[in-house]
Structures are given as C-alpha cells and as structure tokens.
Amino acid sequence: IAGVAGSGKSSLMEYFTSQYPGEVISIRQKDIGINLRSTPATYLDIADAIRALFAKANHVAQAYFSFNSKGACPACQGKGVIISDMAYMDSIETVCEVCHGTRYSEEVLKYQYKGKNIAEVMDMTVRQAIQFFEDADFVRKLDTLVQVGLGYLHLNQSMTTLSGGELQRVKLASKLDERGQIFILDEPTDGLHLDDIRRLMKLFNRMTDQGNTLFIIEHSLDVMKDADYIVELGPGGGLAGGSLLFAGTPKEML
C-alpha cells in the first residue's frame, strides 16, 4: 500500500480490518501494547525459562530472578530508572543510583548461572544469548529475532526505546509460525540497512509461502518491486488524498 504521507493508507487498512473483525493480525506500532517493563525477553515469553535455569542452578525460588517480583531493586521497583514528575514539564528519567540500571537487587546478583549473574545474562544481545544458552528450547524464539534483523537487541532492553519499525519486527518475530493468516504492517523497513531489508523480504516471502497474506504500508522501492500487487493512493495528503492512483502488479506500474 503506497502513497505520500496523509494519502489515506492507514485509513484504508483500518477500514479493511473493520470489515474482517478477528481475522486480521495488525503489526502496526500503535497496536503493540508495551510499557516501561516490556523487554524482548518478556515479549517473546522466554524470561520465565531463563529464570527457571537460574533458580535450578542456585536452589532458590524463581521469583528472585524477576525484576517484577522478589528480585526487584527496592529503590526503583525494578524499572532501572527513577521517574521524576515535573509539574509543568515532561517527566525526567534518570538511571537508578542503587542498581545502576540493572533493575535487580544486590542480593540477587550474587547468584550465577554458567559464571554470569542474571543482570549480565539479560544484558546480552540476542545473538550472544543464542550462543550462551545453546541447546535450550527457547533459543528457537531468540532465533526469530535474528531472522527479522534484530539480533543486536539486548534481552533486557526496554521496548519503549525501540523505533516503530523495530517494535513491529519484534511482534512479527512472535508470529513467524502462523499459517493462513492476514497481516498488516506499517513501514516495517523503517531504519533498516539495505542488507536487512533484503533479509526481511526473504522472511516475507517465506510467510506467504506458508499461506499468509501480507498488506504492507511502505515507501521502500525494494519492498514494492517484490510485491505481488501494489495499491497507490494520493495524489496528495489530507483532503488532497484518498484517491486511487494505481492498482496492479509492479510490472504494470512500469
């Protein structure tokens, strides 16, 4: 789905979604529910598996290795930052001086698994974690992040720091095994290097081979030329938009 900013691309997809309630998987930024405690590890539901390994190795309760439970730094309550509300200004975030941003209490950091504490493990990048955990069952989930070009993310990285394109790819990673579904993505290549765009296109092709249909709002010519069908709206934005300028294959557009 192509067109200048404000031409009606998102509105078209919202209308389409409303016509098929419950049948469309939206991977647009505004549809991804996150908060300050959301991380790639929690979003992909692998944090519990990591905590279980630490708990088993140290013979203590699994809750000790959660910054949302007993393992939380008492000063920042596991947020890693202190948020100061300013009466007439935006809130100010500062790194917690007690845990130095690790989110965990000092007591919890004494426990180790394979020579590293929970904070050190959760600070690993996705690629590092794949090597560290090797044959663990959840490594397959980590590999999905590599497949969408996010191997550089840290397991404990707050998802509030990610770009819109990165957020979409994290959610996309959790849906790679879906079959026969309809997906809507909004500029998923935003901020990506050309090599990463090519990797993402291979992933899209794999998803369509699995019987999925992808509607992609996109400006990238690399994505458009590989599409099966292009719909372009315009000619301008706002009141000047909303008209169908083209509908057909990339070859027909040329």
Which ranges hold each PLM region?
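Conserved phosphate-binding elements of NTP-dependent enzyme cores
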Residues: 1-254
